[in-house]
Amino acid sequence: MKRRHLLASVCAAIALASGPALAQDKVTLKFGWTSSNGEKDPYGVGARIFKAKVEEYTKGSIEVQLYPNRAIGDERQMIEGMRFGTVDAGIITNAVIAQIEPAFQVNDMPFLYADEAKAHKVLDGKVGAELANRLAKKGVISLGWMEGGFRNMINNSKPVAAPDDVKGVKYRVMQNPVYIDMFSSLGGAAVPMAWGETFTAVQQGAVDGLEIPVAIVEANKYYEITKYLSMTNHTYSMIGLLISKRS
């Protein structure tokens, strides 16, 4: 689907989700995410385009207020807030979506997608539609899937050129059984941790490293506190553009 048609569909979905209030008053949507609002941060790029197009297509009747850097909570807090109507919308990593709808765990399986094109084909097809339907039953509407890129290992211990290189290294992982099992099975020490705690944990040596897309390494300055980046491309990072049913 072309971007213009997709965004038009998104705006229509928001209008329906916003209900009768749209006809009476200007609607304000608080839109959050946990990483930066940097020029190259994929979350920030997506959020800014979303804001611009929603306000354009609704002729200003919907205002999108942006809250980067965990301003309205970590991802788990945000998605739970969407379920209960205390958070309007945001960008949430697949692994965190899986905490409320376990079917999403399939996307985090290591080496499941060979490249972005194959991931797009699956997520834009029947599988993505079924995942969205399941999530809607939990009170959260998927407006679409965004590109997070492939995840890579970054640490202060050693480069990763083979599976054995993960042994004995403490990696911060997302609070998701797929990631915990992945690193544990390789002999690493998997340390589940919220994103907001991670930079300080790496900086202070509580963990040796983590695994994130290269764009997030750059946008959040992880290159300043780590020594080794290994292009493992072990998991495709799907991120969801989500809105509360109650918004």
Regions found by a protein language model. Give the residues of each.
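Sec/Tat signal peptide C-region and signal peptidase I cleavage site
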Residues: 19-23
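N-terminal secretory/targeting leader peptides
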Residues: 4, 8-11, 24-118, 126-127, ...
